[in-house]
């Protein structure tokens, strides 16, 4: 973290992302190392960029993690000094309210935002099936073959994504969240 501070001239906050396996100890380590923000990711996150055993069986649900991370921050007298942002399975307003009530400073969404933008759109069903999945079940965004054109660098696939429509859909999702 010190090296990052030197590179950035101490002008930007340093975020450290930790998984939900050992929230108390990993939060403590991040704070003692000098993090400005701890991003705690629970096991229900939609990552597809790892082996199935990690996706399904490693970590704890985000709500179980928050209490331990907050306790670590309180034990260090850093609660509300070092921000705690939580993610991983946050899908609706009730999830956000629970996270905030447990002591998080903010929440973030990932997969929910992709779906709101139009990923997993049924109109690309045939192409999802070619990838061995179906619309609504696609989660291999890291492969860069997203038929909806959202999580890809393929110029032809990217043409499918309408940023105006995607923005409208995401805006609607966030309003009702």
Which ranges hold each PLM region?
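C-terminal extensions of enzymes
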Residues: 158-177
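Glycine-rich phosphate/ribose-binding loops and adjacent secondary-structure elements
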Residues: 2-158
